[in-house]
């Protein structure tokens, strides 16, 4: 009783802590009973029992620490002279439960460094796991990588988005100039679907060709528009593998390129005027806007206007599709959050033991970020069919 005759306040946290301690004690007692029964069967006799059919003799015990969702449990594991330790119940190497493995996997994907993961398990469970343990548990993500790489692609996917983000990938004591190449598409249900993730050179035709070939081999069909930046290697790969498909240059990437050719003091105004071109009511209005923009800035910003003029046609292909889709198909901005998460997570890891481990993590991050796509429809694909009927009439 506290000073003043009052009982200390009972909090929910205190009650929960007491219950967890009670459950841990019950689990420990139960496990030790099972282990003793297992040893008795193995030896052929109980404690101090003298029988003629004895097969072995007891040889003490050793402590085994188990990590569970209720916390750390120290168990006394008996052993025999001939057979060693018993452990059919606990499992000789089963020192952490599926809950702990799930915790480590989630921490790994969500950007917790190996050191922080060790601190996390120590705080929650009373034992720090090693860097190698985190990496070993993370290999369970290999199934997700394989599933994404091999999953059949069913139905027509009219809009295919391709983009890449640079990854500071370090392994085998060297830094490789690689990027995470990502492909997603709008499917027949109008939802976005992550189709593929791989590592390669952003400007490499071979890297993009490999990814596109894999998508086609898995059943990708019905592509009407590819939305991507104007990297030479990417464009060449699309021309090779999807020669009949129209290509939309990402308007945001074009705007950024234009702004780099203008002085800082003019960029805010120029950015607003260039963006207005791609919000015009139709292609004719956009072309008229370009003419006015050229007349206004040609003398002061010749390089910026040359860049805009050169990329204008490729950036306005979206005007040939249903107006309700324009906002969704003129940029690859849908991948901006994914790129940010990939950069953040790979930076937290620092260095990967090999290329496969880097791909494993990046794929897991991509699946996590894009999981929300299944919650809502991105576009109404029936508008494409309506447009085709109207154009054919």
Segment roles from a protein language model:
Residues 86, 258-288, 292:
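Metal-dependent DNA phosphodiester-chemistry modules and their immediately adjacent helices/loops
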Residues 76-81, 88-94, 99, 127-128, ...:
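RNase H-like nuclease fold core
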Residues 1-110, 114, 119-143, 147-159:
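Short, flexible loop/hinge motifs at secondary-structure junctions
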Residues 41-45, 107-110, 123, 127, ...:
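Conserved, well-folded catalytic cores of nucleic-acid-processing
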Residues 1-8, 12, 26, 37, ...:
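Acidic/histidine-rich catalytic cores and adjacent linkers
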Residues 35, 39, 70, 82, ...:
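Mobile genetic element proteins and their domesticated derivatives, centered on retroelements
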Residues 16, 20, 24, 28, ...:
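Amphipathic alpha-helical transducer elements in NTP-driven molecular machines
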Residues 225-232, 237-273:
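Conserved beta-strand -> loop -> alpha-helix junction used to position metal-binding or nucleic-acid-contacting
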